[in-house]
């Protein structure tokens, strides 16, 4: 039973589309520095963010269709709808197309519902100035500046992608004392050096206390070891 795309968050709104974006960013940087590899490119290399996003979404869509094919091949019935547990071994499924409700029974019911982004108390997601990973995956234009709160795998990927695509100022803000805190120390140190070399403003041991969205740009109040900093 699935109400959205097959493959869940990872395939449609996580690991796969971000890797597609990063591949485009890598190709863009190769083109910008083609001379370093012995090539000459006539004219100016420009990034078309709409086409970059289109490619990323296409990669996810193709893989999602592949999952659907495998389900059919293995004789697994796909039900497009939203399920509600109603009693022992019974679920009611509301069809996504016509809202009809159908009851299904099963000896065992597995809950594999995925996840969704959670807003910070002082920075509710509005989809415009404060965005979640979903909006970050499908930008219609590149911002002049960007602050990424949290430097786990997802946050670090977005910081690198947007900076690689030409965003002038990118902050990567981490509460703990290093970025990618779940990775090995030597890996974190190397990636941190690479990010700083790429122009990403890495802030560790930093806590965002407030986000002011009333002006043209967001203003963040960040508590660091050196004191309170205001960034924009």
How would you label these PLM feature ranges?
Residues 3-4, 149-152:
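Glycine-rich Rossmann-fold phosphate-binding loop(s) that bind the pyrophosphate
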Residues 3-142, 168-171, 175-180, 184-187, ...:
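Glycine-rich flavin
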Residues 147-148, 172:
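Hydrophobic Val/Ile/Leu positions in short beta-strands of Rossmann-like dinucleotide-binding domains
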Residues 155-156:
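N-terminal Rossmann-fold NAD(P) dinucleotide-binding loop
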Residues 159, 163-164:
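Gly/Ala-rich phosphate-binding loop of Rossmann-like dinucleotide-binding domains
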Residues 232:
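Conserved NAD(P)+-binding/catalytic subdomain of aldehyde/semialdehyde dehydrogenases
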